[in-house]
Amino acid sequence: MSHLAELVASAKAAINEASDVAALDNVRVEYLGKKGHLTLQMTTLRELPPEERPAAGAVINEAKEQVQQALNARKADLEGAALNARLAAETIDVSLPGRRIENGGLHPVTRTIDRIESFFGELGFTVATGPEIEDDYHNFDALNIPGHHPARADHDTFWFDATRLLRTQTSGVQIRTMENQQPPIRIIAPGRVYRNDYDQTHTPMFHQMEGLIVDKNISFTNLKGTLHDFLNNFFEEDLQVRFRPSYFPFTEPSAEVDVMGKNGKWLEVLGCGMVHPNVLRNVGIDPEVYSGFAFGMGMERLTMLRYGVTDLRAFFENDLRFLKQFK
């Protein structure tokens, strides 16, 4: 009891010297723990007469309360200082430039499709779509390719069963459009098509764009003029273009279209022709009254020519080093 004031003073001095919450807790244990200096003072009460014990106990409790208040105050100071230090370390300099948000980019094939749709949209063409799981009638028969026709063997078709398949061309969209719409018709049909082939210039899935006009007095001259303007627009230069006689079951006459490359060699870019009368009859359009032309082109092929890509498979490998070149 005689040393009580000294213990309180010693405790307060130790509290003020504590540099962090952990050191402060050590002081608390030293003075107020089960075996702490002030706690042990309570054991001296047994040495006093009974009538003096309550007053002495009150003095000890008052001393313990002083130390506890000092502990609480110091703890609040230390926690406040720690919080301020952490906030200072985490201060954001609002004058610094913000983090740049990376912009995505369109896939080069998508760029090609959008560019072609934009050009033909200005000529009054609308975009038509159709199912990728097709029946053999719309994919072959209606296009003047009956079951015995050798052209079927050239398509490397993915069949589900005897009549259902993954479409090998977007021409089926033309058939479905003509079945449901009377001339005049002016459409383009972009979409995915599938053939069982894979090498440097072929993939099992690729993109095609087909175009179709059906109206009165449509001629091959109209076809040539339309495609010539399109190619000059797409490649952004005045190209030397040639139409080479070819064969497609669904057009007559038919032609392959080539452009002169920078290396002085002809490059094949698309196929075209006048819609075969049998195709018009198959959809209930009188070929004596109406005529039309159609064309088809591979989107990957045109993209390769436009950007100088040599391996078709690069479009499908999702290599960001390749794709970022087109942002």
Curated annotation (Swiss-Prot):
Q: What class of enzyme is it?
A: ligase
The principal localisation class reads cytoplasm
- Gene3D superfamilies registered for this protein in UniProt: Bira Bifunctional Protein, Domain 2
Name its GO BP terms in alphabetical order.
phenylalanyl-tRNA aminoacylation
- Which residues make up the binding site for Mg(2+)? E252
Q: Which reaction does it catalyse?
A: tRNA(Phe) + L-phenylalanine + ATP = L-phenylalanyl-tRNA(Phe) + AMP + diphosphate + H(+)
- Write down the InterPro entries for this protein, in alphabetical order: aa-tRNA-synth_II (IPR006195), aa-tRNA-synth_II/BPL/LPL (IPR045864), Phe-tRNA-synth_IIc_asu (IPR004529), Phe-tRNA_ligase_II_N (IPR004188), Phe_tRNA_ligase_alpha1_bac (IPR022911), Phenylalanyl-tRNA_Synthase (IPR002319), tRNA-bd_arm (IPR010978)
Location comes to: Cytoplasm
Family statement: Belongs to the class-II aminoacyl-tRNA synthetase family. Phe-tRNA synthetase alpha subunit type 1 subfamily.
**Quaternary structure annotation from Swiss-Prot or TrEMBL:** Tetramer of two alpha and two beta subunits.
**What name does the UniProt record give this protein?**
Phenylalanine--tRNA ligase alpha subunit
Species this protein is from: Klebsiella pneumoniae (strain 342)
What's the source species' lineage? Bacteria, Pseudomonadati, Pseudomonadota, Gammaproteobacteria, Enterobacterales
Gene for this chain: pheS
